[in-house]
Amino acid sequence: MDNRKRAVIIGMVLGDGYIQVRERPRKTMKPYVEKAMRVLHGPTQRQYCEFKAKRLSWALGGKKINVTKVKNGPGGNYDAYQFTVNHPYFGQVRRWMYPGGEKRYTEKVLNMLNPEGIAYWYLDDGSARRNIDKDGWVTSVSTEISTMCSEQEAMLIADWFKAEYGIEWKIRRDKRKSPDRAFYIACNTSNTHEFAAVVGPYVPDCMKYKLSHVAQVKSHERQAPVGECTSCGKTLYAKRQRGLCSTCYSKDLRAMR
C-alpha cells in the first residue's frame, strides 16, 4: 500500500475508527479471522461518515463500503451512522497501533501520517476555543486535539508536530482522568493558523465549521449576540455558565465561598 493511502487509514484510526481482529466460527469450514474497521458518527455527521467511507474505499483499492443507519447509545435511543469494512491490511494496522491491545501513539505511527490523515484525526478528536471580549470581538483562539494519553505520548506528539510542521503545541491535563489517559495537546492563535493551513485543503465542506474559529479571528467581525445575562440583562456574545455574564458569574462564585 502506498504512503498516501496508508496515511488516510492511520488518520482515521487515530480518530474515531476502531480496528478489531477476532476469530469468527463457520459451520462447515475452519474459523476465519475477521480484520475490520468500524467508524460510527452521530446523526449530524452523516455526510462526514459518507465522505470518510469514500476516502477509505479509495485507500483500499475501490472496495465498496456502505454507510448504514443504526441505533446507538443507552437503550439504542439515538440514531447514528456507521460503516464496517473488512480487509487483511487492518491486521497489520492493528499491530502498529494497538500494541498490548490498547491504542498508543508512537513515533512510527506518527511518521505514517500526512496532512490528509492529520485532518481526519483532528476532525474526529479536535475542538476549538474562542476568547470573546465583552463587546463581542474574538480576541484569540486555540485548537485542541483530545489525545487523552500519557504525558510521555503527548510530549512525543508535540515534538513530532514541531519537527515536521513547525507547529508548537502545549501539553494540557484533564485532572479528572487517570494519568495514562489524562493528557492532550493545544495550540495558540498563531499556531492555530499554521495548523489550519496544513489540514484545511482536506476538510470537506460538511466539516468546515471545525475551522470556523480561524475565520472568525481573521475576519475582525463582531460576533452576533447569543442572549442576555439572566441576572443583569447584559448582552452576551458567547454562552456562559448558568447564563451569566463574566461579572455576575464572578460575583456568584465569591458569594458561594
Identify what each model region corresponds to.
Residues 251-257:
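Short metal-binding segments enriched for Cys and/or His
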Residues 1-234, 257:
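Internal intein/HINT superfamily modules and their associated LAGLIDADG
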Residues 240-251:
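Cysteine-rich micro-motifs
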